[in-house]
């Protein structure tokens, strides 16, 4: 049996953990999701311009699909950027 050697254990790297947004339960009405409603869509986009995941937004899968298609349509229409600079 091997002996415990503390030198072989590498130092752990501190990786920042992204937590859920506080008060992210925004009243989500199905009829308000539209590609022209840029103020609502910006809440579901990260600072880099990426669509946030369901874990962060706490949406159902159906709501997430509606949001993602609206964001993609708004990007094609030129209302939202593909990449934030």
Curated annotation (Swiss-Prot):
Alphabetical UniProt keywords: Chloroplast, Plastid, Ribonucleoprotein, Ribosomal protein, RNA-binding, rRNA-binding
Localization per Swiss-Prot or TrEMBL: Plastid, Chloroplast
GO terms assigned for molecular function: small ribosomal subunit rRNA binding; structural constituent of ribosome
The keyword Electron transport belongs to this UniProt entry's keyword annotation: no
Pfam families: Ribosomal_S18 (PF01084)
One CC-aspect GO term: chloroplast
Keyword Plastid: yes
GO-annotated biological processes: translation
Stored Gene3D superfamilies: Ribosomal protein S18
TM region(s), chain numbering: none
Highest taxon, organism lineage: Eukaryota
InterPro entries in UniProt: Ribosomal_bS18, Ribosomal_bS18_sf
Assigned protein family: Belongs to the bacterial ribosomal protein bS18 family.
Family annotation (HAMAP family): Ribosomal_bS18 (MF_00270)
Subunit field text: Part of the 30S ribosomal subunit.
Name of the protein in its database record: Small ribosomal subunit protein bS18c
Organism: Tupiella akineta (Green alga)
């Amino acid at each position: 049996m091997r002996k415990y050697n503390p030198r072989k254990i590498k130092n752990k790297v501190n990786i920042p953990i992204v937590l859920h947004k506080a008060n992210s339960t925004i009243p989500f009405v199905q009829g308000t999701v539209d590609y022209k409603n840029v103020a609502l869509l910006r809440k579901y986009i990260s600072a880099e311009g990426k669509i946030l995941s369901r874990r962060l937004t706490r949406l159902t899968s159906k709501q997430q699909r509606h949001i993602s298609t609206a964001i993609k349509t708004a990007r094609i229409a030129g209302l939202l950027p593909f990449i934030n600079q």
